[in-house]
Amino acid sequence: MIAQNMTIFFWGVCLLTSGWATYSEASVPENLDKSIDELKAYYIKDDHEIHNAHPVFLRVLKDLKVNLEEPEQNLLMSIIMDTYSRIFTRMENDSLDEATKERIAHVQEHLKKLRENYFPGKSAELKTYAETLWAIKEDDPVIQRKALFELKRVYREATLLKNLKNKERRRRQAKNTKNLKS
């Protein structure tokens, strides 16, 4: 359990310190940087598990800007922030060292402010919907029949969303073309 937490924590620290720091306007505040370094010193004793080529968040972040549009990027980042919050809450509850608990709370506070200021929205509501959908029992015959019964309506709704997105894209392209001619 502690080894898993250490791995998760390390990749989180990497995300906070190096991942975001690559953006010119992004940086880790000095007091947060110090807290992260102190937590790393406390939790990370052996780097072996950390460097096992299975990052927790970095693989998702790698393709974030390439594969997703801005609203999707913000939603995903909000979900990542929420995941960090849950990880650090668990670590704080499991810790017996008061100084470590305080450092974790300090990091949590910074993450909370970041999430509130830069990634507000309905991520909690969307996460609830996603969890509900992921919890569906695909092998349940009743669920299978209900899904089949609802498929045409769901398919129509998906098609409407796709068509709306295409119309908006064409509208933007037409506007850009018009602006270029002017």
Curated annotation (Swiss-Prot):
Query: Where in the body, by tissue, does this protein show up?
Result: Highly expressed in spleen. Also detected at lower levels in brain, gill, kidney, heart, intestine and muscle. In immune cell populations, has highest expression in peripheral blood leukocytes and splenocytes. Detected in kidney-derived monocytes, neutrophils, macrophages and leukocytes.
Q: Where does this polypeptide localize?
A: Secreted
Q: What is this protein called?
A: Interferon gamma 1
GO MF terms here are: cytokine activity; type II interferon receptor binding
Q: Which UniProt keywords apply?
A: Cytokine, Glycoprotein, Secreted, Signal
Q: Which GO terms describe its cellular component?
A: extracellular space
Quaternary state and interactors: Homodimer.
Q: Entry's Gene3D superfamilies?
A: 1.20.1250.10
Q: According to its UniProt record, which protein family does this protein belong to?
A: Belongs to the type II (or gamma) interferon family.
**Chief location bin:** secreted
